[in-house]
Design a protein with these regions (language model features):
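Short beta-strand segments
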Residues: 17-19, 63-65, 95
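Short, surface-exposed beta-strand/loop "edge" segments at domain boundaries and coil↔beta transitions
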Residues: 42-44, 61-64
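Generic recognition of short, well-ordered alpha-helical interface segments
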Residues: 31, 74-77, 107
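A short, polar/proline- and glycine-enriched secondary-structure boundary/capping micro-motif
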Residues: 28-33, 54-59, 65
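Generic detection of short hydrophobic beta-strand segments and adjacent strand-loop junctions
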Residues: 65-69, 123-124
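C-terminal helix-rich "cap/oligomerization" subdomain common to oxidoreductases
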Residues: 12, 81-127
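Contiguous beta-strand/loop segments that form the cofactor/metal-binding neighborhood of enzyme cores
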Residues: 1-50, 79-89
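Active-site loop of classical SDR/Rossmann-like NAD(P)-dependent oxidoreductases
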Residues: 68-80, 97
Length: 127
């Protein structure tokens, strides 16, 4: 499927990260899910851009805790946090990441894309 990106990497700390991005659903609405796994933990954020629901499983407990965030607009919250911090320096805590981290994340997504494109090109040129 040409609209799929999948990447797995290992951090210097030894932790493993992975990303899958797929554009495959038909229709107007789209589906988003973010999964985070750590030793004993599972966090799953579903429908992040419409009616976000966070499912949390903790070490030693098979139950999933469910947190619903009605009427949450992550794009609005992100921009509002930045504007509030510019207008009132006491609100800087609302910015949850540094510009440097954001720039490195963006560069990382491009590295994933370039590696994927190089892989596809190599497949087309192999005997």
């Amino acid at each position: 499927m040409p609209r799929v990106t999948s990447a797995t990497w290992k951090y210097e700390s030894g932790a493993v990260g992975s990303l899958m991005h797929v554009i495959a659903l038909h229709g107007r609405d789209f589906f988003t899910e973010i999964d985070v796994f750590a030793d004993g933990y599972s966090l799953r954020l579903c429908d992040a851009y419409n009616a976000p629901v966070l499912y949390v499983r903790r070490p030693g407990d098979d139950r999933e805790e469910v947190y619903k965030y009605d009427d949450d607009d992550p794009f609005f919250s992100e921009v509002a946090g930045m504007i509030d911090a510019v207008e009132d320096p006491s609100q800087r805590h609302r910015i949850l990441t540094s510009y440097d981290d954001a720039a490195r994340t963006y560069a990382f997504t491009w590295a994933i894309r370039r590696a994927s494109e190089a892989c596809v090109a190599a497949r087309h040129h192999s005997p």
